[in-house]
Amino acid sequence: MITIDILVESDGWNDEKMLYNITEKALKTIMHHLSLENVVSEISLLFTDDKHMAQINAQWRGKNKSTNVLSFPAFPLKVGDSPGPMLGDIIIARETVVLEAENEAKSFQDHLTHMIVHGILHLLGYNHETNEEASHMEELERKILQKLSIKDPYAELS
């Protein structure tokens, strides 16, 4: 079981319960898919705005702009490692997710779910630094999102 902590820090986000439910469903689907159902850990999600995300992105990545999602693993994991007591933190910027969903003709909830899945996979050691890593991570995202009844987010991009 993984404990989920949600913090909503800006206006415009749906209620905390809905964000918790989306996160819980995504997390359970990921952990089942990766055969990690028995892991005991904790994850924190901060739902914020572009202004705060740009500050965090500048501080931690040297990029003075907002982004959709950032993940901060509590401990560095390699793919396949079992997480420790704290999985890590995920930060999501509302305006960026809304704009991307509109530009890609996706529902906000589906795109938000994708960003949560993407962030959790980063916490579990998955990356997209190389073409091979990106292909592997995208394929995993596709499979997980399909289980969540969400269309392939990369279909139009391929």
Swiss-Prot record:
It comes from the Bacteria. One of its GO terms (biological process) is rRNA processing. The keyword rRNA processing applies. Keywords: Cytoplasm, Endonuclease, Hydrolase, Metal-binding, Nuclease, Ribosome biogenesis, rRNA processing, Zinc. Its main location: cytoplasm. Pfam families: YbeY. Zn(2+) binds at residues 118, 122, 128. Its cofactor is Zn(2+). Binds 1 zinc ion. It is found in: Cytoplasm. GO terms for cellular component: cytoplasm. The keyword Nuclease applies. InterPro entries: MetalPrtase_cat_dom_sf_prd, YbeY, YbeY_CS. Its EC number is 3.1.-.-. GO terms for molecular function: metalloendopeptidase activity; RNA endonuclease activity; zinc ion binding. Single strand-specific metallo-endoribonuclease involved in late-stage 70S ribosome quality control and in maturation of the 3' terminus of the 16S rRNA. PANTHER family: ENDORIBONUCLEASE YBEY, CHLOROPLASTIC. NCBIfam families: rRNA maturation RNase YbeY (TIGR00043). Belongs to the endoribonuclease YbeY family. This is Endoribonuclease YbeY. The gene is ybeY.
